[in-house]
Amino acid sequence: MVPPVQVSPLIKLGRYSALFLGVAYGATRYNYLKPRAEEERRIAAEEKKKQDELKRIARELAEDDSILK
């Protein structure tokens, strides 16, 4: 087994700094995007509800207008 390699403290500091900055950036980006995504999901749900209602009405009209009464 190969012994562990000594890594410069400056390189370690750089790696951990980059890791911390990446985590901080991800957290702020998530907090920025989360409300926008919730709004998009709410709008999509409302549109789906409207489309379902229109389909239901069209289906009822198609059943009422059937030739085979």
Swiss-Prot record:
Keywords annotated in UniProt: Acetylation, ATP synthesis, CF(0), Hydrogen ion transport, Ion transport, Membrane, Mitochondrion, Mitochondrion inner membrane, Phosphoprotein, Transport
Location(s), subcellular: Mitochondrion; Mitochondrion inner membrane
Main location group: mitochondrion
Modified residues (Phosphoserine): 66
Pfam families: ATP-synt_E
GO biological process: proton motive force-driven ATP synthesis; proton motive force-driven mitochondrial ATP synthesis
Domain of life: Eukaryota
Residues bearing the modification N6-acetyllysine: 34
GO molecular function, one term: proton transmembrane transporter activity
One CC-aspect GO term: mitochondrion
Function noted in UniProt: Subunit e, of the mitochondrial membrane ATP synthase complex (F(1)F(0) ATP synthase or Complex V) that produces ATP from ADP in the presence of a proton gradient across the membrane which is generated by electron transport complexes of the respiratory chain. ATP synthase complex consist of a soluble F(1) head domain - the catalytic core - and a membrane F(1) domain - the membrane proton channel. These two domains are linked by a central stalk rotating inside the F(1) region and a stationary peripheral stalk.
Subunit composition and interactions: Component of the ATP synthase complex composed at least of ATP5F1A/subunit alpha, ATP5F1B/subunit beta, ATP5MC1/subunit c (homooctomer), MT-ATP6/subunit a, MT-ATP8/subunit 8, ATP5ME/subunit e, ATP5MF/subunit f, ATP5MG/subunit g, ATP5MK/subunit k, ATP5MJ/subunit j, ATP5F1C/subunit gamma, ATP5F1D/subunit delta, ATP5F1E/subunit epsilon, ATP5PF/subunit F6, ATP5PB/subunit b, ATP5PD/subunit d, ATP5PO/subunit OSCP.
Record family assignment: Belongs to the ATPase e subunit family.
Record's protein name: ATP synthase F(0) complex subunit e, mitochondrial
Top-level taxonomy: Eukaryota, Metazoa, Chordata, Craniata, Vertebrata
